[in-house]
Amino acid sequence: VAAARSRGIGLQTFKVGPDYLDPQLLASASGRPCRNLDLLLCGAPWVRQSFHWWSNQVPLSLVEGVMGLYDGRGPSSEGSSAAIALELNLPVLLMVEASRQAGSLAALVRGFRDHEPKLNIAGVVLNGVSTSRHQQLLQEAMGSIAMPVLGVIPRDESLELPSRHLGLVPPAEQEAWPQRLSQLGQKASQWLQLEKLLALMANPNQNTPQTQTQNQAQNPISWSLGTVLSKHKAHQQATHQKSEQRPCVVIAKDKAFHFCYPELPEWLEALGCQVQWWAPLEDQALPEACAALVLPGGYPELQAKELSQCKRSLGAINQHCRLGLPLYAECGGLLLLGQELLDADGEAHPMAGVLPFRAQRGALSLGYRGATPLRAGLVLRPGEQLQGHEFHRWQLQETPAQKAAEQAWRLEGWGVLARVEGWTNAALHASWLHLHWGGCPSIPLRLRDAAVAANAKRQTTQN
């Protein structure tokens, strides 16, 4: 990606699955927001609209996979990188760990190629090659199965990217990241057959049988908004009446809170909201015009001590909730709402004190979840079925604090026991579950409506 950008070529990156961290690195390398393609969270129609719309904006597109090529939900390939490639009719470049192998690699790559005959594996990049002799052995092995080798990456410790328990360290926290990115681009030009790779990444909308349909792709949010509003004509009329009202929706964003899909603020802006960013770690009050607050996920545990000392920020969140103003929180944002947060050393740090729990490290909770709302709340309605993703290592211990909300929904997933989770009331949604609003467009619509109502109530009170 960095090599293409250094040549002045526009490239749109995508990431398979619900990841928040890899997209930050890809966005930094391309200079454009990275878009997640998740069949399980968003469904195939959204994935198609998103891919074709954003890939139409620039000459090149690259989709980074997730896990192994065929790894999807549970033991299946549902939602996998292969499923995305088949859905979008894209060629696949297989990154192969080649260290300590030679002829065996031919069997492995042939297995990947033949496992799904409809999949077009256009070539491989060999990673971890030790010597020129090793490279020759590998290339002959690939030649024996007629598999093009489009790159050879030697063992190089400088390529390793720093990581922690939930994934790679974001670019904003990596030392000398711009210089590192430039060096990576130079090495890519040296080790990869860039001309052939750039040809593979050329806008697929220009050379596939579905060209007419793909070139008519809409902005996915506009398309989704039109779809959901057409189902609710009464709501569509109300939306038109509210179009001149622009409530302020504040989104937390700093080192502690940055797990936010680019579509989240785009949805709110498309619905007529004014979006403002707010850094809790800077210990500041919420913007005066704040009609609704969004607390996304992130790493509050790494800044637990600093957050606990941000009395103005924590007090602002508490006051926001006591006034009954809308608040939407996911995962790390949920942690901020508890009574206490225990850091890695077991030291307790006071949080905003909105919800009756203290949080401490626990077992890994990871995977897609089907969510069934138990009651109506800020953004949920009984009878709906939603898909989300859970990824954390926390357990919550209830405290005797005053009950502020009811349990939100029942979660089910592959290989895990069903359980009731989250908090909700008319002005609050707080849960471990990450949602992508491309798969549940009613959520931002309801949040916007709540912000409009809160704004109107405030103006009436002031008058």
PLM regions and their residue ranges:
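Structural motif
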Residues: 62-64, 93, 125, 294-296, ...
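Amide-donor transfer/coupling interface in amidating biosynthetic enzymes
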Residues: 159-207, 230-235, 240-241, 245, ...
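ATP-dependent carboxylate-amine ligase catalytic core
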Residues: 2-88, 96-119, 132-136
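Internal gly/pro-rich beta-alpha loop/helix module
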Residues: 102-209, 219-236, 242
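Beta-strand->loop->alpha-helix junctions that form or flank phosphate-binding loops
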Residues: 15-16, 149-157, 274-282
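Phosphate-binding active sites in nucleotide-utilizing proteins
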Residues: 247-322
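Cysteine-nucleophile active-site neighborhood
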Residues: 300-377
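N-terminal phosphate-binding or glycine-rich loops at protein starts, especially the Walker A/P-loop
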Residues: 1-16, 123, 133-139, 265, ...
